[in-house]
Amino acid sequence: MRQILIAVAIALAVAILLTPVLIRLFTRQGFGHEIREDGPPSHHKKRGTPSMGGVAIIAGIWVSYFGTHLVGVLMDGKGPSASGLLVLGLATSLGVVGFLDDLIKLRRARNLGLNKTAKTVGILVAAVLFGVLALQFRNADGLTPGSAELSYVREIATVTLAPAVFVLFCVVVVSAWSNAVNFTDGLDGLAAGAMAMVCAAYVLITFWQFRNACATAPGVGCYNVRDPLDLAIIAAATAGACIGFLWWNAAPAKIFMGDTGSLALGGIIAGLSVTSRTEMLAVVLGALFVAEVTSVVVQILAFRTTGRRVFRMAPFHHHFELVGWAETTVIIRFWLLTAIACGLGVALFYSEWLTTVGA
């Protein structure tokens, strides 16, 4: 628990101190965000707000992770794990794709960055590498960071994927979550606040897995997760970094995370869900992100098949703005829904454990 608190504190401090530095730097460089002409009229005043603030989030997570492990090595001799480095590697790779996308947008002074093919290839490469490596690095207990068995709260033994199918599954998971968080990042502080809550839920889940790991506490209801404490540290660091960034990103935002941050944060959810064996539970925890990306898919399918739109604008947080909700009202209500979803997800996780142990 001490390491988790250290991780939160370091990440929060780095993000909250580095973000204003980036604001000044990007403002001097003229790296102002371009706004869609067909977006809500209230967003036009945001034109010129610095973007690429996700750099502060990623930096906060990395500094926190290694800072926490430096303390950990001094206390118990344990350093970074394969699971932790894989999750951070995935998030950083996606962050690089997002950074290039943001940079091109800012250089061209238009809301179009990497073309779809280049962006898709970048995400695909990161996802494939993650999927392949997730089945490597077997520890002394025979556990790898990922599992070929499909998981809800723990592995479903009746559904085992072939290695190639598992990699394809990882591609779907990574692509879905990175795009889901990316679509959600359309209102000041919405994605950062929601992400902090999802990661807080993952801290509880992975720490519980650590306290009830089969490797150290074998018995009914134990969890076969390779590095649960390290995953808890990453979740805590991400929550702290998002809160620190939110200090400057809350409405009215002084900086946006950009694709640099949103793609990286999507990678965090994808990586945590695979390495903690909770791919299906993550859909509940991240219900807001799922709803946002679903609204985009529904809008596209409806328009292509019927020529009509279901929402005034997608992602659907813009729909509520266009029907008269104030931006801050949408944000706060969506945060409340995220808190409810996270509470439900944690409750489902814990109730499954109670059922398993017969409590």
From Swiss-Prot:
It is a multi-pass membrane protein. The keyword Cytoplasm does not apply. It is found in: Cell membrane. Keywords: Cell cycle, Cell division, Cell membrane, Cell shape, Cell wall biogenesis/degradation, Magnesium, Membrane, Metal-binding, Peptidoglycan synthesis, Transferase, Transmembrane, Transmembrane helix. It comes from the Bacteria. Its cofactor is Mg(2+). It is an enzyme of class 2 (transferase). Pfam families: Glycos_transf_4, MraY_sig1. GO terms for cellular component: plasma membrane. InterPro entries: Glycosyl_transferase_4, PNAcMuramoyl-5peptid_Trfase, PNAcMuramoyl-5peptid_Trfase_CS. GO terms for biological process: cell division; cell wall organization; peptidoglycan biosynthetic process; regulation of cell shape. Its EC number is 2.7.8.13. The chain crosses the membrane at residues 3-23, 55-75, 84-104, 117-137, 156-176, 190-210, 231-251, 255-275, 283-303, 330-350. The keyword Transmembrane applies. GO terms for molecular function: metal ion binding; phospho-N-acetylmuramoyl-pentapeptide-transferase activity; UDP-N-acetylmuramoyl-L-alanyl-D-glutamyl-meso-2,6-diaminopimelyl-D-alanyl-D-alanine:undecaprenyl-phosphate transferase activity. Catalyzes the initial step of the lipid cycle reactions in the biosynthesis of the cell wall peptidoglycan: transfers peptidoglycan precursor phospho-MurNAc-pentapeptide from UDP-MurNAc-pentapeptide onto the lipid carrier undecaprenyl phosphate, yielding undecaprenyl-pyrophosphoryl-MurNAc-pentapeptide, known as lipid I. Belongs to the glycosyltransferase 4 family. MraY subfamily. This is Phospho-N-acetylmuramoyl-pentapeptide-transferase. The lineage of its organism: Bacteria, Bacillati, Actinomycetota, Actinomycetes, Mycobacteriales.
